[in-house]
Every structure is written in structure tokens, then in C-alpha cells.
Amino acid sequence: MTKHAAYSSEDVVAAVAAPAPAGRHFTSFQALKGAPLDCKKHAAVDLSASGAAVVGGGPWFESMKASSPRRAADAEHGDWMEKHPSALAQFEPLLAAAKGKQIVMFLDYDGTLSPIVEDPDRAVMSEEMREAVRRVAEHFPTAIVSGRCRDKVLNFVKLTELYYAGSHGMDIQGPAACRQPNHVQQAEAAAVHYQAASEFLPVIEEVFRTLTAKMESIAGARVEHNKYCLSVHFRCVREEEWNAVNEEVRSVLREYPNLKLTHGRKVLEIRPSIKWDKGKALEFLLKSLGYAGRNDVFPIYIGDDRTDEDAFKVLRNMGQGIGILVSKLPKETAASYSLSDPAEVKEFLRKLANKKGARQP
């Protein structure tokens, strides 16, 4: 197996360790009935100020508050940034920690490479971001790890030289093309293929049809088919109907004990009840690339959602590489560093590619 070139940072004197943790396909868009709704306004509602009774809220209701965090006080934000400093501000020390090691890049899609938008079908990445990812992939093995269907995220990214892990890592495929001589040979890369939940396809399809019918009565709700999992989006649902979405989904899942319900940013996720997540996908890809159990590897995982926390935790447990959370506001995370938005992600990727490119003969 042909290796990627390891990253070297001779101009950086000292390595700085990552800081310790803080402790801690779509249905058609439903036209809104009655008065028009400003999705952005409703997406930003702070549930803690609602005062509305939420039947059966509990942990789910609390998670929705977490997905619409209040604006943090300056002091709180400053404390959080001390524990999760900007990966741009700490760029040189970060590279020093990777000195002599093989960088492997893992990237979430929504909220990381593209902005979060009301219509998930319109979550396109910019040409500038695509170029930044392409340049990074010239130098380092690069994977997109997304909750989206693998084919859909490939259609968004449009870079065939990457590894893609869709459906929260349950559907993994190696590159269709390897353009650089230092990449894993094409035959070996194409052999990287894994589907963790094929036996669940019929039941996922059945639940998709049922939920699609159920959500027709809730304006703004959408069901996305991600092959091995389903996403019920409620970003454009009125706040007073959020619990109705939750109850409808739970009522369907009572008939399917082999499926589990998780949540992200204004989305409910339905997945097979198997021990597989984005962290497992990261481990699988490192092993497939021949990097498992090696000390000369430096994985970097960048993501914005709670589903990315599984990957951040894997890196912490490995004691190798770093996790970078994309967030403007403080939130509990196992990531070591932070970036505020996709624009900063793009700048980070550009700097990484430029540093590596400057060292080429």
C-alpha cells in the first residue's frame, strides 16, 4: 500500500499538546398553512424562554434547547475558548504536534463544509470550499463523514478522490479516482468498502413511507432518506409543533425495536440499533489505510454536530490527533479545538494545504 507523504514542520520549534477537555432523498417541502413563517426566526428560538408546556419533553426537550443555544455571556465564551482554542489561532503549534506524522483528514459536511440551511437540498458547498478540500486531499488521505446518504454527499462535494462515509458511517466507499502519485493505489482504495447495516434496508424503507405520511400534517416537517438511516427535519416547523414531530416519530418507532432515535441540530435521526457511528467509521478508515495501532499518524476530525462527538471521543481515547468543533457558541464537546463557522474551516484547510505545498520540491 502506497503511503501519503508525512507532514513535516521543520520551521516550528515546539509542539504544544491539545488542551484538556472541559470535563465534558426528501419528501416534498410542505407549504406552511396560514400566516407565512420565517424559518430563520423560528430556528433560533430559545426554548428556555418559551414557557410553553411540552408534553413528554424530558431529555428530548432539553436536547432541543441545546440545539438552539442561548447567546453566551462574554465571560462564559472566554472560558470556553481557553479550553477549546481556535484552530486558526493555534495553527503553528498544532502543526508542530503533527511533525513527522501522517495527517489523515476527516470532515463532516453540513455545518462544516456547507452552511446550515432551511432546505437541506440546498446545502451546497462553495467552489472555494471545494477547491480547499481538493488541495488538502492532494497531500493527505481525506474522508467526508456525514449523516447524509453517501451518494447524496458525493453529489454535493463532487470530488471522486475522497473517501466517503455516509449514513453516519454505515456506508463507506473508497475513492473512485486517485490523481496523486502519493495516494493509496486506486485498486486498493476502491477495495475500501463497508456497509454496516444492509439487513436493515427493508425496514428503513418501510419506516420512511410511514413517516412521510405522518409528517404531511405538520407544516415544514421533512423526512430525508439516507439509505441506512432517516432524518426528520423540523427546522421550519413552528416551535409549538416540535413536540408533535417528536411524538409522531416515537409512535412509529414503538413498532420497530431494532431502530433507535437520536437527535442533532433541528433534526431527529432514526438509525439501526447497532454499535456503529462516526467514531467507528473513523477507526475503520484508519485501519483500512494501514494506520491502525501506529504512533506516526495524526488524524484531524472537523465537525459541528453532536453525532461528531463519537469521533472526537475516539481521538481522545487514542491520544492521537485532534478534534475540531465548528461552533460560534460554547457547548459541551470532546473536541480539543474550535472553529466558528464553515468560513473558518475553509481558511484552516487552505492554510494546511499551503503549508504542505510550500514544502514540496
Curated annotation (Swiss-Prot):
It comes from the Eukaryota. This is Trehalose 6-phosphate phosphatase RA3. InterPro entries: HAD-like_sf (IPR036412), HAD-SF_hydro_IIB (IPR006379), HAD_sf (IPR023214), OTSB-like (IPR044651), Trehalose_PPase (IPR003337). One of its GO terms (molecular function) is trehalose-phosphatase activity. The lineage of its organism: Eukaryota, Viridiplantae, Streptophyta, Embryophyta, Tracheophyta. One of its GO terms (biological process) is regulation of secondary shoot formation. Removes the phosphate from trehalose 6-phosphate to produce free trehalose. Is specific for trehalose 6-phosphate. Does not possess activity toward glucose, sucrose or fructose 6-phosphates. Regulates inflorescence branching. Required to establish the correct identity and determinacy of axillary meristems in both male and female inflorescences. May act through a sugar signal that moves into axillary meristems. Acts upstream of RA1. May have a transcriptional regulatory function. Its cofactor is a divalent metal cation. Expressed in axillary inflorescence meristems. CDD domains: HAD_TPP (cd01627). Disruption phenotype: Additional long branches in tassels and abnormal long branches at their bases in ears. Abnormal identity of axillary meristems. Pathway: Glycan biosynthesis; trehalose biosynthesis. Its EC number is 3.1.3.12. Keywords: Growth regulation, Hydrolase. Belongs to the trehalose phosphatase family. The keyword rRNA processing does not apply.
